[in-house]
Amino acid sequence: MNGISNALNGLYDISGVEVGQHFYWQIAGFQVHAQVLITSWVVIAILLGSAVIAVRNPQTIPTAGQNFFEYVLEFIRDVSKTQIGEEYGPWVPFIGTMFLFIFVSNWSGALLPWKIIQLPHGELAAPTNDINTTVALALLTSVAYFYAGLSKKGLGYFSKYIQPTPILLPINILEDFTKPLSLSFRLFGNILADELVVVVLVSLVPSVVPIPVMFLGLFISGIQALIFATLAAAYIGESMEGHH
């Protein structure tokens, strides 16, 4: 039980981890991480604006933009169906939101000039460059797969913790707490490392060398969004099937 308690404490305390300086707003006596909110709002505005443009005037013969958005939707459906199974339909919006938010957030770190915006403390960066964002996304995924299992199986969902033998109960419980930890640290670590490498190379050789690294970073950022969305869908499918 000590291991489970430590895991719970880790999930609670991890949001206090800080890398570098941060800019906070004081709202109702609470410190709100302003950097993450500002950049997250920009990403959400980009996604909402793109969605409005995509559905504003659909054509019978699709335009290039409409074809692109239909391809993205089909791609998300394929990922969801592959990992969840035939009952994937209700989960497409969730998986799609996760994938698109992470994808645009990751790319914003490389393509948007966040650094030119001056703050009293710290600097703006991709939302996924902050551990608070990645932990929040991972916890949302945890809530989603618990909900998926309970909505399909009711209280019988908890029988999975004593399968194939009750001896594995502590390990099976601990596994549910390590999933969000691994999701959050994988995404946070990769995006932070990518931005740090680019910053260091730009400071050392500001002309040519960082360009290939930036393209590699864009590729890795896309892969990280796909990995997160795929694992989220896999966890949801696993909870609905009731096996590991």
Curated annotation (Swiss-Prot):
Q: Which family does it belong to?
A: Belongs to the ATPase A chain family.
The membrane topology of this protein is:
Multi-pass membrane protein
Keyword Transport among UniProt keywords:
yes
Q: What does this protein do?
A: Key component of the proton channel; it plays a direct role in the translocation of protons across the membrane.
Q: Which Pfam family is an annotated match for this chain, by its short name?
A: ATP-synt_A
Q: Which PANTHER family match?
A: ATP SYNTHASE SUBUNIT A, CHLOROPLASTIC
For molecular function, the Gene Ontology terms on record are: proton-transporting ATP synthase activity, rotational mechanism
Q: How does it assemble?
A: F-type ATPases have 2 components, CF(1) - the catalytic core - and CF(0) - the membrane proton channel. CF(1) has five subunits: alpha(3), beta(3), gamma(1), delta(1), epsilon(1). CF(0) has four main subunits: a, b, b' and c.
Q: What is its main location?
A: plastid
Q: What highest taxon heads this organism's lineage? A: Eukaryota
Q: What NCBIfam families does UniProt report for this protein, alphabetically?
A: ATP_synt_6_or_A
- Entry keyword Plastid: yes
What GO cellular-component annotations does this UniProt entry give?
chloroplast thylakoid membrane; plasma membrane; proton-transporting ATP synthase complex
So where does this one cross the membrane? 35-55, 92-112, 131-151, 196-216, 217-237
What's the protein name? Answer: ATP synthase subunit a, chloroplastic
Which keywords describe this protein according to UniProt? ATP synthesis, CF(0), Chloroplast, Hydrogen ion transport, Ion transport, Membrane, Plastid, Thylakoid, Transmembrane, Transmembrane helix, Transport
Could you tell me where this protein is found in the cell?
A: Plastid, Chloroplast thylakoid membrane
